[in-house]
Amino acid sequence: MKYFNELKKAMGWLGTKPETLFMGQAVTYAGTGMTNTLSDIDPNKLIELPVAEDFQLGVSIGHALNGSIPISIFPRWNFLLLATNQLVNHLDKIKSYSHDEFSPKVIIRTAIGSERPLHPQVQHIGDYTEAYKLMLQTVDVIRLDEPDQIFDAYKYAYERNDHRSTILVEYGDYYNEK
């Protein structure tokens, strides 16, 4: 069981679900290690977005409110930081401030940036998992330490009936190491 293969398997499984769509940077064009995990997805389910993280998560929330289950891809935690407004003030709180009228479910995919074979410097390798667990009340954060966690975690995020959103945190270095 390999880390990358389990990610590809999970993405392939999610891609078979009629209400899922995948959005972010480098989902249709090569550019990150995550791109290759989407190679089995129907191209019509892939939405390439510009580098505008706050906008991306806002669009993801909108799709979820419309009945889709978006898999919103932020290749590194350091990029997801830029969507913190949408994450903390909207996705995490919308059920409360809408008096339970709205409870969108978004699957957020991010990673701790890889350091090997080339170290991209500190602005690309942050791990903010614990900080976001403290900030978020209705969005769960799951760090994927081992290959055998991956498929079940993505399946759980998709199948959960409580309409909670989930952030799944991958390790960029493990794509080739585990």
Language model features by range: what are they?
Residues M1-K178:
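Thiamine diphosphate
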